[in-house]
From Swiss-Prot:
Pfam families: NuA4 (PF09340). Component of the NuA4 histone acetyltransferase complex which is involved in transcriptional activation of selected genes principally by acetylation of nucleosomal histone H4 and H2A. The NuA4 complex is also involved in DNA repair. This is Chromatin modification-related protein EAF6. It comes from Yarrowia lipolytica (strain CLIB 122 / E 150). GO terms for cellular component: NuA4 histone acetyltransferase complex; nucleus. PANTHER family: CHROMATIN MODIFICATION-RELATED PROTEIN MEAF6 (PTHR13476). Residues 1-42 form a coiled coil. Its main location: nucleus. The gene is EAF6. Belongs to the EAF6 family.
Amino acid sequence: MSDQKMNQYEKLKKQLKDNINKKKTHDKNLNSLEEQIFTLEGAYLEETSHGNLVKGFDTYIKGAQSKKRYVFNEDDRLFSLSSAVFLKHQAKTGAGGDLDETKNERKKTASQKRRKGDSTPMSGDEKPSKRSRVD
């Protein structure tokens, strides 16, 4: 009876190792797909700053000037931010940068451009300051 239990134990042990290897493979595939989604989502948001599914098509319909180039916010990433696994992986490995750090960098760039006299807003959330009318 001990031989039978030992065989069963070895069989289960082998099965467990196989399942762990399969899980690692699936995790790698999932991570790869999520990174691809992150990259493609960023490209979509940058290329369609005049109108997209996230912000809407108001500026596209109104025929806004194509010279204005709006930078998207990291909060606009509907697909990437919906995956808790991907966010954990990014935080662990630092891959793709920290989202808060990326937001801060974009804010710094926007404020530097405004200081240089460029009044063009850098994102859909920022608006140029209104000048008070002097009579």
